[in-house]
From Swiss-Prot:
GO BP, sorted A to Z: protein import into mitochondrial matrix
Mitochondrial matrix topological domain: 24-167
Taxonomic source organism: Caenorhabditis elegans
Protein name: Mitochondrial import inner membrane translocase subunit TIM50
UniProt keywords, alphabetically: Membrane, Mitochondrion, Mitochondrion inner membrane, Protein transport, Transit peptide, Translocation, Transmembrane, Transmembrane helix, Transport
Gene: scpl-4
Domain FCP1 homology: 243-387
Transmembrane annotation, as ranges: 168-188
Length: 452
């Protein structure tokens, strides 16, 4: 039996090709023996089969073959390879066939039963490796083996325990919510009592739904605490005589008008003082104006900043975020709660949304972003000083006029320069006319202006 037929009977087609390829590399060449030494000539050499990929990409380890099995495989290869070559030589040249027969070595012995047993054992080992590789690949793919009865019982017990804990937690949460709601209604729906334990009557007393009305009123108070200013009257009453109460009140935003917040890795969070701020406060400070800081910043942040740049106490009052009205995500200043006449209130800010409740009192100026070459406060101080000197009974028309410009202070400066030039021209015109009259009298013989 030839080697190819033997392998086909013991292996599948793919495995037979692999086996023949591994053990059929030694053949007799017509050109003579190869120049390279046969590696199987060394009996002490052991050959390792390479890794062979078969069946769904599984990989099998190399198989170490003993020396005696290698020699038998060489004999099988020589028999398989020489038979077709001899037939081909018979067709091409009889002379070469005769020389081949005379010089060919004696035929190899027929395969014995031991070789067949080895091949069968090799096939069994390959099948075992294939099954082991398939199991390892299936386990690495994430499949779980629940065939173990103990493991299945443990999983079922864990699932039941989780269901029980979830059910208990839901019961506790639902019960706690019910108890909390009842306690809330009882606490905020009860009538108030005085120090002696007597019930204080309110507008809801005597009604069957009085507890629910009181609960709704509590919600309204919470909303007002967040949305509305902290008190109805933000400023105290004007100063009585003999103290001097300024005629006009200036309400000014702190952030990005007088100072600018800045954060760096080196200094951290700090506020930059705007150039000419001291001059600005000297011009508008008491007793010229009643200055009020009305900022959307918190008192904890803004109060120390105001105290640091105003050691002379030129700012009379300070109002912070708790005194603003929260509307549509913005902190709005409600000037109607200042306890002052709005016809004499000047509100200075860069954000139009902050003064949306009183736009006629707002003087909108550009936002200062920290540039240290800014001189807008000087021009703004001159504008406010002009309003003070005008002694107007209602400042709102002037504020509305200058608010139509992007930079009211710059527009005021431009108009002030223009008016000063007009005044200079008016002063020069009478001098020129008097000189002409004086010289015209001399030219025409008139002596009326000699003594002038």
């Amino acid at each position: 039996m030839s080697l190819s037929k033997l392998t086909q009977t013991c292996f599948s087609r793919h495995q037979a090709k692999t086996f023949i390829r591994l053990y059929s590399s030694d053949f007799k060449s017509l050109l003579g023996p190869p120049a390279v030494a046969n590696p199987y000539a060394d009996n002490g050499r052991t050959r390792f089969a390479p890794i062979v990929p078969i069946n769904h990409g599984n990989v099998f380890a190399s198989i170490k073959l003993p020396i005696n099995e290698t020699q038998e495989a060489i004999a099988f290869k020589s028999e398989v390879e020489e038979a077709p070559k001899v037939e081909k030589l018979e067709v091409e040249s009889p002379k070469i066939e005769a020389e081949k027969v005379l010089s060919s070595p004696p035929p190899a012995p027929a395969p014995t039963s031991s070789a067949i047993d080895e091949l069968n054992s090799l096939k069994d080992s390959l099948e075992k490796l294939e099954s082991a590789a398939s199991k390892s690949s299936s386990s690495s793919g994430g499949s779980s083996d629940n065939s173990d009865p103990g493991n299945a019982e443990e999983i079922e017990a864990r699932r039941k325990r989780m269901e029980r804990n979830t059910r208990i937690g839901a019961y506790v949460l639902f019960g706690g919510s019910i108890i909390g709601f009842i306690s809330f209604c009882f606490y905020y729906g009860r009538a108030q009592r005085d120090e002696f334990g007597n019930v204080i009557s309110d507008e809801f007393s005597g009604s069957f739904l009085a507890p629910f009305y009181r609960i709704a009123n509590s919600f309204k108070l919470w909303r007002d605490y967040v949305v509305e200013p902290a008190r109805e009257q933000l400023l105290p009453d004007p100063l009585p005589a003999p103290y001097l109460q300024p005629k006009y009140t200036i309400v000014i935003e702190l952030k990005n008008i007088l100072v600018h917040p800045e954060w760096t890795y080196k200094t951290g969070y700090r506020f930059l003082k705007r150039p000419a701020l001291d001059y600005f406060l000297d011009v508008i400070g008491y007793p010229n104006f009643e200055v009020v800081i009305y900022s959307s910043e918190s008192m904890m942040t803004a109060a120390p900043v105001v105290d640091s740049f105003d050691p002379k106490q030129r700012i009379m009052y300070k109002l912070f975020r708790d005194c603003t009205k929260y509307m549509n995500g913005h902190h709005v200043k409600d000037l109607s709660k200042l306890n002052r006449d709005l016809s004499k209130v000047i509100y200075i800010d860069f954000d139009a949304k902050s003064g949306q409740l009183n736009p006629e009192n707002m003087l909108r100026v550009p936002e200062w972003k920290g540039n240290m070459d800014d001189t807008s406060l000087v021009d703004l101080a001159e504008l406010l000083k002009t309003i003070h000197l005008s002694d107007a009974e209602d400042v709102r028309p002037m504020l509305q006029y200058y608010s139509q410009y992007d930079d009211p202070a710059k527009e005021f400066r431009r108009r002030a320069v223009y008016l000063s030039q007009q005044e200079e021209q008016k002063k020069q015109q009478p001098d020129d006319s008097s000189m002409l009259k004086r010289y015209s009298g001399r030219l025409f013989g008139s002596r009326r202006h000699v003594n002038a």
